[in-house]
Design a protein with these regions (language model features):
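Extended beta-strand/beta-hairpin segments
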Residues: 1-52, 60-146
């Protein structure tokens, strides 16, 4: 087994109406409670970062999966939506829905349509974030081939 450590440091001052900082090797972002939840809404927030992590992981995994399947001349634009709920006073991410729009050459479109379901599952199974949250968060994938 190989382990990889991903180190992020966070800073916060006392109180919910403050702005903190999340810092890693590349990330350097202000963080706060979103305004939709009564916070100051400056910078990003953990909910958005969770959806961004899931989305970026999935799109990278999907691109690699398509490349290995010899679909080389493609582009992917994806929107991901995280749906959270408040139940018994606790917030929980219930679902993350990925909607990848895959542009492919006309000559490869039919072949991709035939193999797409299997390739989507492979990509999801190779995504570390999907593997980490599966069972706690419902992951939906609604692809479009352009």
């Amino acid at each position: 087994m190989t382990n990889h450590d991903f180190i992020v440091t966070t800073q916060w001052s006392v109180g919910r109406d403050e702005v903190g900082l999340a810092k890693g090797d590349v990330i350097n972002e202000s963080i706060s409670i979103p305004s939709s939840l009564g916070g100051v809404g400056e910078g990003t927030n953990p909910d958005e970062m969770l959806v961004a992590a899931a989305s970026s992981c999935y799109i990278i995994s999907l691109a690699a999966t398509l490349e290995r399947a010899h679909f080389n001349d493609i582009s992917i634009n994806q929107e991901s939506v995280g749906t959270a709920s408040l139940t018994n006073g606790k917030f929980k991410m219930e679902q993350i829905k990925h909607q990848p729009k895959i542009s492919v050459e006309a000559s490869q479109k039919e072949a991709l349509e035939k193999r797409l379901d299997k390739l989507l599952k492979i990509a999801d199974n190779n995504c570390m974030i999907s593997n980490s949250i599966r069972g706690n968060v419902d992951i939906k994938i609604e692809p479009y081939i352009l």
